[in-house]
Structures are given as structure tokens and as C-alpha cells.
Regions:
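Conserved, mostly hydrophobic/aromatic
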Residues: 190, 227, 261, 289, ...
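Proteins enriched for Cys/Gly/acidic motifs involved in redox and nucleic-acid/cofactor modification
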Residues: 1-234, 272, 309-320, 344, ...
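Terminal RNA-binding accessory module
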Residues: 373-469
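Short flexible coil/turn linkers enriched for glycine and charged/polar residues
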Residues: 173-176, 186-188, 283, 293, ...
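Radical SAM enzyme [4Fe-4S]-AdoMet core and its adjacent flexible, acidic
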Residues: 40, 236-255, 302-305, 365-396
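Short, solvent-exposed loop/turn segments at secondary-structure boundaries
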Residues: 82-84, 201-206, 236-241, 301-304, ...
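Conserved SAM/AdoMet-binding glycine-rich loop
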Residues: 104-107, 114-116, 218-340, 351
Length: 469
């Protein structure tokens, strides 16, 4: 059964919030915090809670580290380059710390949940005052207070799985789109993946808590809700309340909004889930289903618990049930022991599925995973060649993928000004497709209808038909 933090512990942290607030109130100017979340949407969501706690402690926010009184990096551990970026950023803060001895530097998240990384940071980066893992984020007020009042340096990396803290304050990045975590952790232990080690075992939030949060966001005017979890398809096993049932209940909430979710695992994706999406009023017609590889031999080595036949059957059912379903995926190139024949299996699967887009990565060795100990005879040069070959295949598919929408009138959530220089507005359709269209700034946050006229490799463009709210 999932454990939740008891109210007494949260009240203790609230007392620390008030203590830090009192200290900050004595300053001549409001202290500023710089918070940077690296990596996935779950980290971004955690960063919003961190900002919520900091705001209650009396901090304002700045995008510039040079102006900050507190700098906090919320880190990612999925790939080595993400860790290298963090170390580079922390190293660059050394001069700031020398100029301002009162500057507080904190590093949290998945990267420092790894013991060897946490110890390296403690020994090699003395400018870092607070190091905290993924399971103790709610105790940040206490760690900051102890630094301010006692100049205490903190390393808090508990090995036990975290518990769920309900009711933490949130400062959301958007007034239109909101993320709602529905579960934490992962039980799959794919051999290449560090997530179960840094996020712990699967823990689902109670259905009534999720439903209440989503209702509140819709009532507050949010137009898109993104449901988050390392494996949302395995939600609710503790409560006999599966993910398809949760989606069905959320879809009943009155209002004009869109529901989307990530990330899914093919072994837990079911016809029931696909049917729920197809029959819904609000759920996105976009299915992100990471395949990782098109070789059954390598899928077994990855401990993925499905084969390509099962995966293709799910895709074909989704195409049958969900109108013009948008399909995206994740693919790893160069897994230890992968041969060129294995790689060609991935190429053929990509051609058969015809993804709208694919997030493709060269294998990144993660210390502590089973794959890290596997022989890896593939040269970096070959991995690079395979990677580029796969990108070429996907790009050729993606160039024409969105042509199926030409002539359709689609509803789009207007999110802002487009990236091009032609003054178009932009947003996403129910399929998760980027849609650029002629419009005005006052449409931001509203649903509009657009007639699609042109398909591009990564977006579509069209003509505004109507503003719907």
C-alpha cells in the first residue's frame, strides 16, 4: 500500500517555512531564487512544487543566477550528457559563491539520488550547500532553515522509497496547461534504465486526490491537463482502480479541456485503454508508446516484457479505433550486443508503424544498471552511423506524416506566438500536432477552429475558422 506523509510531518515543515520567511522578512530586499529543472516533465512538475515552497518562504524568482540569493538545480539522471550539463553548471557557480558567501546553492533530484554522484558532489563541489534526493523534496524548508540559521551543510539521500506528499504548494509555469503527477517510481527494471533506482518503486496517488486536483485546475481555467508518471499504464494497482478507469472518470468532468498523459509502457498498454481514448470527449488522440528497439532478441536483453508482434498488434488496434491517431515513440540505438541485423529490425518496424515523430537516442551507459555490465563491442562510430541512418528514415516518414490532416477542421488550444517570423499564432490539436494559424494575441488560452492547409515535417499550418470560447 502506498504510504503518504502524515499531516504532522507536513506541519513541521510548515513551521520551518514560517521560520525562513521570518528571516527573509528582515532583509532589506526580497531574496531571489533561481530554480532550473533538467530533464523530464516529472522533474518540471517537481520544480513547480519547489517554487511553491520557496514562495511561501518569502523568495521571489529570477532567471539569472547572477542575481540570485538561492540557486537550486533539480537534476536528471537518464543520460550521461544530462549529468555532464549539471556538473558544468555547478562548476560555473564557484565564482559566484566566492563573491557572495551568503549565496545558497542546492542540488536535488534523480542525479544526486545516486550515492556515487552525491558523494562526488559533496567532496568535489564544496560550493554546494544542500544535496537532496528524490524522496525528501518536501523537507526542503528544513534544509534551507538549517543553512540560514546554523550554516549547516546537508546531504539527504535516503535509500528507502519515498512516500507521497499531498498538498504541497505549486507555482505553475503556465496559466493554460498544467501537469498532474498520478504516480511515482517504476517496477519494470529495464536493464538500461536508472529510473527505478532513483525514483523508487511504483506508488500511485489515491484516485480521489487526482480527480480533485484535475477538477480544481479545470475550474481555475486550465485548458490542458498532462497526467504524469514513469509508467502511467500501471497506475492504481494498489487501489484496484486502473489507468483506463481513471481516464474515464476524469473525462466525465464538465468543461472545455484536453487530457493527455505520459509515459506509457507497451507491456501495460491494453485494448481497454485504447477504447477509453477512442470513446472519450477530452482525451488526446496521441499515443506515445516507447518501443526502444525492433529486435525481439534485444527487447529481451532490455527486459521490456513484450515482443515486436505484441507491439505491432497494439499499434494496429490503436489505428483502427482512434481517428487518425498520432503515434510517437522512443528508440535506443547501440544497446550493448546489438548487431546491425538487430538494428535493421528497428528500421523495418519504424517503416511499418510510420510514426509521426520518434525520439531517438544513442545508448547511454548508466552505472548500477544491468546493461552497464554487459559487453559492448559496438564502436562509437558504428553507433553514430546507425543513429543517422534511423534519423534519415524517420525524417522521410515525417515529411509526409501530417498530410492526412490537410482539409480537416481541427480544434486547437492557442498557446502563444509561433516560432516563425510571419506573425502566426500557434497551439496543439487534439492529436498533439503543432498548428500554426493566422490569429491574434487575445486568442491565447482559448480554443479555436483551424482549417489545415499545409503539412510540414513537424507541424501543420492553416486558416482560422472560428474562436470557440
Amino acid at each position: 500500500m502506498t504510504k503518504e506523509i502524515n499531516k504532522e510531518e507536513l506541519l513541521i515543515q510548515q513551521e520551518y517555512i514560517e521560520k525562513v520567511k521570518a528571516i527573509n522578512a528582515k532583509r532589506e530586499q526580497m531574496p531571489l531564487a533561481h530554480v532550473h529543472s533538467f530533464g523530464c516533465q516529472q522533474n518540471v512538475s517537481d520544480g513547480e512544487k519547489i517554487k511553491g515552497m520557496l514562495a511561501q518562504m518569502g523568495y521571489g524568482f529570477t532567471p539569472e543566477t547572477a542575481f540570485a540569493d538561492l540557486i537550486l538545480f533539480n537534476t536528471c539522471a537518464v543520460r550521461e550528457n544530462a549529468e555532464d550539463r549539471v556538473f558544468g553548471n555547478i562548476g560555473a557557480l564557484k565564482k559566484l559563491k566566492e563573491k557572495n558567501r551568503n549565496l545558497i546553492i542546492a542540488v536535488g533530484g534523480c542525479m544526486v539520488q545516486q550515492e556515487h554522484i552525491a558523494q562526488r558532489m559533496r567532496k568535489s563541489f564544496p560550493q554546494v550547500d544542500i544535496i537532496f534526493g528524490t524522496h525528501v523534496m518536501h523537507t526542503l524548508p528544513q534544509m534551507i532553515y538549517e543553512k540560514l540559521s546554523e550554516n549547516r551543510r546537508t546531504l539527504s539521500i535516503p535509500e528507502s522509497d519515498g512516500v507521497i506528499a499531498e498538498g504541497l504548494p505549486v507555482i505553475r509555469e503556465s496559466k493554460v496547461k498544467a501537469s498532474v503527477p498520478i504516480m511515482y517510481g517504476c517496477n519494470n527494471f529495464c536493464t538500461y534504465c536508472i529510473v527505478p533506482f532513483v525514483r523508487g518503486r511504483e506508488r500511485s496517488r489515491r484516485p480521489e486526490e487526482v480527480i480533485a486536483e484535475v477538477k480544481g485546475l479545470i475550474n481555475d481555467g486550465y485548458k490542458e491537463i498532462l497526467l504524469l508518471g514513469q509508467n502511467v499504464n500501471s497506475y492504481g494497482k494498489e487501489y484496484d482502480f486502473g489507468f483506463a478507469k481513471l481516464l474515464s472518470e476524469l473525462d466525465k468532468i464538465p468543461g472545455k479541456y484536453k487530457l493527455s498523459f505520459m509515459t506509457s509502457h507497451p507491456k501495460d498498454c491494453t485494448h481497454e485503454l485504447i477504447d477509453t481514448i477512442a470513446d472519450s470527449r477530452h482525451i488526446s488522440y496521441h499515443l506515445h508508446l516507447p518501443v526502444q528497439c525492433g529486435s525481439d532478441r534485444i527487447l529481451k536483453e532490455m527486459n521490456r516484457h513484450y515482443d515486436t508482434a505484441h507491439y505491432i498488434e497494439l499499434i494496429e488496434y490503436a489505428k483502427k479505433r482512434i481517428p487518425k491517431v498520432a503515434l510517437t515513440t522512443d528508440i535506443i540505438v547501440g544497446f550493448p550486443g546489438e548487431t546491425y541485423e538487430d538494428f535493421l529490425g528497428t528500421v523495418e518496424l519504424m517503416k511499418k508503424v510510420r510514426y509521426d515523430s520518434a525520439y531517438t537516442f544513442i545508448y547511454s551507459k548508466r552505472e548500477g544498471t544491468k546493461a552497464a555490465a554487459m559487453p559492448d563491442p559496438i564502436s562509437d562510430e558504428d553507433k553514430g552511423k546507425w543513429f543517422r541512418q534511423l534519423l534519415d528514415v524517420q525524417n522521410s516518414i515525417g515529411e509526409k506524416a501530417y498530410e492526412r490532416f490537410i482539409g480537416d477542421e481541427v480544434e486547437v488550444l492557442c498557446e502563444g506566438i509561433g516560432r516563425t517570423a510571419d506573425g502566426l499564432m500557434t497551439g496543439h490539436s487534439r492529436h498533439g500536432v503543432i498548428v500554426d494559424f493566422n490569429g491574434t494575441r487575445d486568442m491565447i488560452g482559448k480554443y479555436v477552429t483551424v482549417r489545415i492547409q499545409k503539412a510540414l515535417p513537424w507541424a501543420v499550418t492553416g486558416e482560422l475558422v472560428s474562436v470557440n470560447d
